[in-house]
């Protein structure tokens, strides 16, 4: 690796497995020091042991303000500051609008939206003190377009997209950038029950976690120094349009004339 993040300290939520663990490893590989949190303590401790002195694991329930404060304090105490936040933690639940329980709705808002808000709020002070910062909010393509039966997930991911923009405007004068990443289907433990071909993507496959992590590294680095309030899509072409794969088998001469 080329040391693109040397001198930076990052905090990652939901970092014990899946995309979060991939983000942690990718940033450490580029020279960052990383504090990462999760509620999956055994898995988190295993990742921390693998990365040795470059990383610290903390228990972090993103719905709890005090645990965010403790995570930030760990970063500042252990590594001398904080420059990057990756709001990665999230959950998915599904159900028809008629049957979707209020408790499920409230739970997903607490984790996917309030958790992001609390994370942003917790890192502003140390980032202002550093005179710079990069906040990376992991949204989803469901933050760009709706999906049937994913009502809470879609609502929270749209909201994260909006929160990204309002905080980018507020924090920009302090040198703090805020951007959102919108992955499509990614191969993680959270999505291992989802058929890989559920979306017709231009590339014809789901993403590997590292393909999202590569973008996280870019946004954490100074290479993205003029990017803020923006949406970065990593979806294999899912939201580019409908992939009518059967059209390729139709002879051009046999296509009817369509009138709109």
Curated annotation (Swiss-Prot):
<dbReference type="GO" id="GO:0047044">
    <property type="term" value="F:androstan-3-alpha,17-beta-diol dehydrogenase (NAD+) activity"/>
</dbReference>
<feature type="binding site">
    <location>
        <position position="186"/>
    </location>
    <ligand>
        <name>NAD(+)</name>
    </ligand>
</feature>
<dbReference type="Pfam" id="PF13561">
    <property type="entry name" value="adh_short_C2"/>
</dbReference>
<dbReference type="InterPro" id="IPR020904">
    <property type="entry name" value="Sc_DH/Rdtase_CS"/>
</dbReference>
<dbReference type="InterPro" id="IPR036291">
    <property type="entry name" value="NAD(P)-bd_dom_sf"/>
</dbReference>
<feature type="active site" description="Proton acceptor">
    <location>
        <position position="153"/>
    </location>
</feature>
<keyword id="KW-0520">NAD</keyword>
<feature type="binding site">
    <location>
        <position position="17"/>
    </location>
    <ligand>
        <name>NAD(+)</name>
    </ligand>
</feature>
<feature type="binding site">
    <location>
        <position position="62"/>
    </location>
    <ligand>
        <name>NAD(+)</name>
    </ligand>
</feature>
<feature type="binding site">
    <location>
        <position position="88"/>
    </location>
    <ligand>
        <name>NAD(+)</name>
    </ligand>
</feature>
<comment type="subunit">
    <text>Homotetramer.</text>
</comment>
<protein>
    <recommendedName>
        <fullName>3-alpha-(or 20-beta)-hydroxysteroid dehydrogenase</fullName>
        <ecNumber>1.1.1.53</ecNumber>
    </recommendedName>
</protein>
<keyword id="KW-0560">Oxidoreductase</keyword>
<feature type="binding site">
    <location>
        <position position="188"/>
    </location>
    <ligand>
        <name>NAD(+)</name>
    </ligand>
</feature>
<feature type="binding site">
    <location>
        <position position="157"/>
    </location>
    <ligand>
        <name>NAD(+)</name>
    </ligand>
</feature>
<feature type="binding site">
    <location>
        <position position="153"/>
    </location>
    <ligand>
        <name>NAD(+)</name>
    </ligand>
</feature>
<feature type="binding site">
    <location>
        <position position="38"/>
    </location>
    <ligand>
        <name>NAD(+)</name>
    </ligand>
</feature>
<dbReference type="GO" id="GO:0006706">
    <property type="term" value="P:steroid catabolic process"/>
</dbReference>
<dbReference type="InterPro" id="IPR002347">
    <property type="entry name" value="SDR_fam"/>
</dbReference>
<feature type="binding site">
    <location>
        <position position="19"/>
    </location>
    <ligand>
        <name>NAD(+)</name>
    </ligand>
</feature>
<comment type="function">
    <text>Probably involved in steroid metabolism.</text>
</comment>
<comment type="pathway">
    <text>Lipid metabolism; steroid degradation.</text>
</comment>
<keyword id="KW-0443">Lipid metabolism</keyword>
<keyword id="KW-0753">Steroid metabolism</keyword>
<feature type="binding site">
    <location>
        <position position="61"/>
    </location>
    <ligand>
        <name>NAD(+)</name>
    </ligand>
</feature>
<comment type="similarity">
    <text>Belongs to the short-chain dehydrogenases/reductases (SDR) family.</text>
</comment>
<feature type="binding site">
    <location>
        <position position="191"/>
    </location>
    <ligand>
        <name>NAD(+)</name>
    </ligand>
</feature>
